[in-house]
Amino acid sequence: MRHRHGLRKLNRTSSHRQAMFRNMANALLRHEVIKTTLPKAKELRRVVEPMITLGKKPSLANRRLAFDRLRDREIVVKLFDELGPRYATRNGGYLRILKFGFRDGDNAPMALVELLDRPEAEVAEQEAVAA
């Protein structure tokens, strides 16, 4: 039986996995959309969603917990000042994982991971006005 086998190992050591998901979480929180393989995307959801939930309660202890996991001050500031208030009324489910075809070379299933409620329409309008 495959009960209680927690996470995907992804053919990596635990330190490599931890560093990879830290980097992927930072990239996702910075750019709000990333492209990766489907198994990594599903595992990344388990890392990022608790971080956003942490960002909804801005206390010093929560900031320190977030910094301990992300190790990037700029991202921690964005998490608590921008993303926490954005998702204040949403109870979980902050990410969308879209299947994105297959990668050339090894045919790995790819996925697009994005934060919900991104303010992309305003950015597109500002770029159109600037051009």
UniProtKB/Swiss-Prot annotation:
SUPFAM superfamilies membership: Prokaryotic ribosomal protein L17
Keyword Ribosomal protein attributed: yes
InterPro entries associated with the record: Ribosomal_bL17, Ribosomal_bL17_CS, Ribosomal_bL17_sf
Matching Pfam families: Ribosomal_L17
Gene Ontology cellular-component terms listed: cytosolic large ribosomal subunit
Keyword Ribosomal protein: yes
Assigned keywords, A-Z: Ribonucleoprotein, Ribosomal protein
GO MF terms, alphabetically ordered: structural constituent of ribosome
Domain of life of the organism encoding this protein: Bacteria
GO biological process: translation
Record PANTHER family: LARGE RIBOSOMAL SUBUNIT PROTEIN BL17M, RIBOSOMAL PROTEIN L17
Family: Belongs to the bacterial ribosomal protein bL17 family.
Subunit structure: Part of the 50S ribosomal subunit. Contacts protein L32.
Name of this chain's protein: Large ribosomal subunit protein bL17
Organism listed in the record: Azoarcus sp. (strain BH72)
Higher taxonomy: Bacteria, Pseudomonadati, Pseudomonadota, Betaproteobacteria, Rhodocyclales
